């Protein structure tokens, strides 16, 4: 099996392992050297806040003193283990790293059909609540260690919503590849996704939506090899992405609706009128 829990059998070099019920309760440790210190990699599952799915979680644990904790919120059409090199590097330098596959991604998706689909999700709220559940699971064990959230691309949008809801639980955040969309374009995209889902269903994968979302990304390059050249200037990185069955799949209409939901949420303007008297001692001088 490529999709589903059986992918855990592809693990190489584990020192200790336990596999039960098709890996649903699978836990393994993999010890690595290189760079600064030893790293132990642990894989486990947590129940999603949607009450249906199991979140696939990976923990990179430094075997020396833990200086900080970094939680990864990965991007669209990828999975948290794609950050293995970064996570291992950070762990070798004293930072514990943890992250989960979002709903509809990686090992959290139960089948190929579920890739790009967010089952029982209340928009992006469920994805963010899942991130917070991972935070609580590790914060309970290490309450005094500085904690940071790293979000990339779509994961940065989720991280920004996380900051608006659970920001007090963090010591800092790193937003990579984040951005925004013009309100008119976002409104048109939401209307299109909603209309298509009424006709074709939530699981439908639409070429039109894909062109609306990514069609312009390659236009800045004079010559391109693939439709994903915009991902990286390194051709090998692009090829690795294209060859990975957990990457580059087409989002469902449901998936796009969740994506547009989080963009709408984080871009909602806050209208603030600040009033201060000329004699107010706290006013700026």
Regions found by a protein language model. Give the residues of each.
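N-terminal cap/lid segment of alpha/beta-hydrolase-fold proteins
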Residues: 38-62
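Short beta-strand element of the alpha/beta-hydrolase
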Residues: 67-75
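Serine-hydrolase catalytic-loop signature spanning alpha/beta hydrolases and amidase-signature enzymes
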Residues: 77-85, 97
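Conserved alpha/beta-hydrolase
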Residues: 87-112
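Alpha/beta-hydrolase active-site loop
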Residues: 119-139
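Alpha/beta-hydrolase fold nucleophile elbow
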Residues: 142-153
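Alpha/beta-hydrolase-fold enzymes
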Residues: 159-246
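Single conserved hydrophobic/aromatic residue that forms the stacking wall/gate
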Residues: 276-285
